[in-house]
């Protein structure tokens, strides 16, 4: 059984009511409603409960050491991370924004998450390092809390691919940096190489995805709705995650289960369409564990598969197997893509391919993250290295009205090893197992 890393910690502030204005740290502001109202702090520290993290403290210390090496090379005094993926990668805390800004400030000596008061002490319990809570009583208290750590007139590293124009202007006003440096590319390169601890978590995730896949397969029969099948897969995965990670927080796990024409797009939402005999199906399970994404994707048919569909399916499965064989150390992403393009062209189906052949894994979801430097596309020349984790997922979409119409996709997760790769996806692909119901 896997477990998250946790240790008891003393409560640094047991209640807000027991503290006088300003006792949490940071300036206070008189409310506009009159002097009889209690002054309210702009920020404070509220630390209580036991700290529980996805990884050991040493894992986060090592990540921060690598980051600080990058900061030193680029002459950065402090980094402000605002994206869910980088805040989680360097601190363990996966925030829930709900319209409020969140961040992580890293200096040469400090690592401090900045969170909203609505979360109370939960961000501290789930982060490595210090935590400051900002209040809603005055607009832009988030930026005042950030400035209390960074100071002014510093070289500030930030994520240009995440910071909005509005927030970028506020950074300039409140931090008054001497220079801003985009550090997003450097942090992405760091995230692309997975530590042993990360690979262990991803291995668990792949196994959970398989559990969801088998639960979905068991539900498939004529007359069942897509939503019914999807819920069965999602519930099975959430129960499995809770069994493997009893101290985790559970959020964001989902299923896309598509049938018939709904299979034409890889990211098409679930509907209430009822399954019919001969339908093409697309099974997609996505367990989320502490912000780490894994996936299983398979083509299936209800009851029977026609000759034209079987031909397209066989071609895509063959491309899938070829692609897996190409994912080895030293291979260039664009070269792998070119070889798979040639294979599809030989079979006269290249025109039915709609996106790349695979991508990196780690802290990402359908609304945060994505390590765009490690994708199997024509415009990515990254060379595969041991420690990288990447998918092989060719897809062909045959338009409605043509023989074999529908979307065909197989998806496995592979660890790049010293001498090849390891496929950690175990759910079978192909017609021998996936013509069901």
Put a short name on every predicted segment.
Residues 11, 19-437:
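Active-site neighborhoods and metal-handling regions in enzymes and metal-associated proteins
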Residues 8:
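Cationic, low-complexity basic patches in intrinsically disordered or flexible, solvent-exposed regions
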């Amino acid at each position: 059984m896997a477990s998250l890393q946790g240790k008891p910690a003393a409560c640094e502030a047991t209640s807000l009511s027991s503290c006088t204005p300003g006792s949490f740290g940071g300036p206070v502001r008189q409310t506009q409603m009159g002097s009889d109202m209690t002054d309210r702090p702009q920020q404070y520290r509220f630390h209580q409960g036991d700290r529980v993290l996805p990884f050991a403290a040493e894992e986060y210390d090592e990540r921060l050491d690598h980051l600080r090496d990058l900061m030193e090379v680029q002459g950065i005094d402090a980094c402000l991370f605002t994206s869910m993926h980088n805040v989680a990668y360097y601190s363990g805390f996966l925030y829930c924004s709900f319209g409020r800004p969140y961040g992580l400030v890293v200096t040469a000596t400090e690592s401090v998450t900045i969170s909203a008061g609505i979360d109370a002490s939960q961000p501290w319990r789930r982060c490595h390092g210090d935590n400051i809570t900002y209040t809603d009583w005055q607009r832009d208290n988030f930026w005042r809390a950030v400035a209390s750590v960074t100071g002014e007139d510093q070289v500030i590293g930030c994520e240009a691919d995440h910071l909005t124009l509005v927030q970028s202007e506020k950074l300039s006003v409140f931090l008054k940096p001497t220079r801003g440096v985009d550090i997003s590319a450097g942090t992405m390169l760091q995230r692309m190489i997975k530590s042993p601890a990360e690979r262990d978590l991803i291995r668990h995730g792949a196994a959970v995805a398989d559990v969801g896949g088998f639960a979905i397969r068991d539900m498939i029969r004529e007359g069942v709705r897509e939503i019914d099948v999807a819920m069965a897969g999602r519930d099975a995965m959430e129960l499995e995650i809770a069994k493997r990670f009893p101290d985790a927080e559970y959020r964001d796990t989902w299923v896309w289960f598509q049938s018939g024409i709904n299979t034409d797009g890889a990211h098409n939402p679930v509907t209430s369409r009822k399954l019919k005999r001969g339908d093409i199906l697309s099974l997609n399970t996505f367990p989320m564990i502490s912000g780490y994404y894994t996936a299983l994707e398979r083509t299936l048919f209800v009851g029977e598969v026609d000759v034209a569909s079987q031909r397209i399916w066989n071609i895509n499965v063959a491309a899938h197997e070829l692609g897996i064989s190409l994912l080895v150390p030293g291979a260039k992403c664009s070269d792998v893509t070119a070889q798979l393009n040639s294979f599809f062209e030989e079979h006269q189906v290249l025109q039915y391919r709609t996106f790349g052949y695979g991508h990196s894994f780690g802290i990402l979801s359908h609304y945060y993250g994505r390590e765009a430097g490690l994708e199997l596309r024509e415009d990515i020349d990254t060379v595969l290295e041991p420690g990288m984790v990447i998918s092989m997922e060719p897809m062909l979409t045959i338009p409605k009205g043509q023989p074999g119409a529908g979307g065909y996709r197989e998806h496995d997760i592979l660890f790049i090893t010293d001498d090849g790769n390891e496929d950690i996806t175990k759910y079978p692909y192909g017609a021998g197992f996936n013509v069901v119901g």
